[in-house]
Amino acid sequence: KLVIAISVKADGKTYTTTEGRCLKRLGRNSKPAYPDELSNVYSSVQNPDFSGRIIGESTLDDINKLEVYSLKEKLRVRDSKSTLPDLDDIDFLRDLQLIKYDGDVERLTIAGLLFVGKETSIQRLLPQAEVIYLHYSADNLEEYDARLDLKLPLISVIDKLTERVQAYSKIENIQVGLFRLEVEDFPERVFQEALLNALSHRDYQSNAAVYVKQYPDRVVIENPGGFLEGITEDNIITHPSIPRNK
C-alpha cells in the first residue's frame, strides 16, 4: 500500500475558507479561531510568545508522564468532544506545541516544561517558576504561620494550593426563601481561575516568585511582571489584549 506524506512549512500567514471562516487544527478536529485568538497571532509578530520558546537544554526525558495523563484527563472533562486526549502522548504534546523540533531533535518549550515537566527538570531549567504560599491567622496578620514552597508543574501547583486554601475555607449557611444555600469563604473555581491567570500571565524572565497569601477574610495573589509596551494605567481597559504567554 502506497502512502504519500506531504509536509508543508508554516509561512506565518493566516488563511480563511471561501466562506470567510478561520479554522485551527486541534488533534483530528478543525475548530474555529475566534477574534481574540487571531489578535494574539497578530500581536505575536511584535511580541514573540515567551512560553513558546524551545528550551535548548531539555530532552523528552524531562517529561513527567503522570502530568501528561493528568492534563489529558482535565481536557477530557473540559471538552468531552475533543479528540486530543485520544492521541498518544507525543502527538498530544506536539499538537499543543508543548514540544517542538529543534533541528532534528524534539525538545520541550517553556509551556511544555511548565505543564508536563518533571519537578527536578523545572528546578534545573526554570528555577524561577516558583509559587510560595503563606498563611496568616487572625491573631497575627503581619507574620505568616504556615508556608509552602512549590516548584511543580502548573496543574500540580493548582491542585495542591486549592487543597490548602480549601482546608482553611469555612462555609456559611444562608437562608434564601425556602432554600438554604452554602456560601464558601473562597469558592474553589474562583480561586483556581485567579491562580491560573496569575501563573499564565506572569513574567517568567523575572527571578521573582508568585505569592499566594491567605488571610482569614481574603486571598491575595501577587505575580511578577509589569505592563507590556504600549499599555499604561490609563489605557489598560481599552487597549487591545497583548498576552505575555499564550
Question: What kind of feature is each model-predicted range?
Answer:
Residues K13, G27-P243:
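Active-site helix-to-loop segments that bind/position phosphate- or nucleotide-bearing substrates
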Residues K1-L23, S30, K118:
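Divalent-cation
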